[in-house]
Swiss-Prot record:
Pfam families: DUF167. SUPFAM superfamilies: YggU-like (SSF69786). This is UPF0235 protein PCC7424_0673. It comes from the Bacteria. Signal peptide: none annotated. Disulfide bonds: none annotated. InterPro entries: DUF167 (IPR003746), YggU-like_sf (IPR036591).
Length: 73
């Protein structure tokens, strides 16, 4: 499964919202430094979809707020 994600780093609270177009808007506490926000994003998505962190990969947007995430079943 592939999903579009818009990430908002440095938020006060972690939050996952669904946009009208079906993509996810995810607020993260971590700053976008040294991959910390990406690590938190993968951990949060693994919990939401009940998969291991190794089943989630960032296909595009590694250094962008807009990302394409692939989740393997």
């Amino acid at each position: 499964m592939k999903i579009q994600v818009k990430v908002k780093p440095n938020a006060k609270h972690q939050k996952i919202e669904e946009a009208e177009d079906g993509s996810l808007i995810i607020s993260l506490k971590s700053p976008p430094v040294e991959g910390k926000a990406n690590q938190e994003l993968i951990k949060l998505l693994a919990q939401k979809y009940r998969v291991t962190k190794s089943q989630i990969s960032i296909q595009s947007g590694l250094s962008s707020r807009n990302k394409l995430i692939e989740i393997l079943d």
